[in-house]
């Protein structure tokens, strides 16, 4: 069924796009919104994109990946790896948690294994966000009845705020190699 993996990420992407549309936000840097396919087959969509970028590679500063963001737990933990791949990223992602209703669990490294890894391996800063694993992962039981819609809204708002903050970063956004 794929409700969490990864209809939840697509839903977050659409919510964030809608928020940008309504807010009329004009960030300092451009933002490319994209949804990849064939992640399970070896990150084929993200690999193709990185190998055929529509802009110069040095113009791509940070990739934020939302994969499995629909099952926010009772502790409201939003996990992310790769926050240390750009300057002050860990601090920013933690600070964005203040007043968000979420408890960000932020790792400088631990980049993970989803589409953002393709960017990281090509020296582009990358953060992967998720709300945690569950027994329904990669099973037909990954159904909409188990999605935490209110949690998904909190996660989408957090990611929107992260995008705006990163796009308006005053300092240069440079790649920092992690583990």
Where are these regions (language model features)?
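Short acidic, glycine/proline-rich loop/turn micro-motifs
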Residues: 1-3, 74-77, 139-142
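Metal-dependent peptidase/peptidase-like ectodomains
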Residues: 36-135
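Acidic/histidine-enriched alpha-helical segments
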Residues: 26-38, 63-66, 169-179
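Short, contiguous acidic/charged loop-to-helix segments that flank catalytic cores in large enzymes
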Residues: 1-6, 79-84, 106, 146-151
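His/Asp/Glu-rich mid-to-C-terminal helical/loop segments that flank catalytic regions of hydrolases
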Residues: 11, 18, 22, 135-179
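Catalytic-loop motifs flanking and including active-site residues across diverse enzymes
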Residues: 5-12, 45, 89, 115, ...
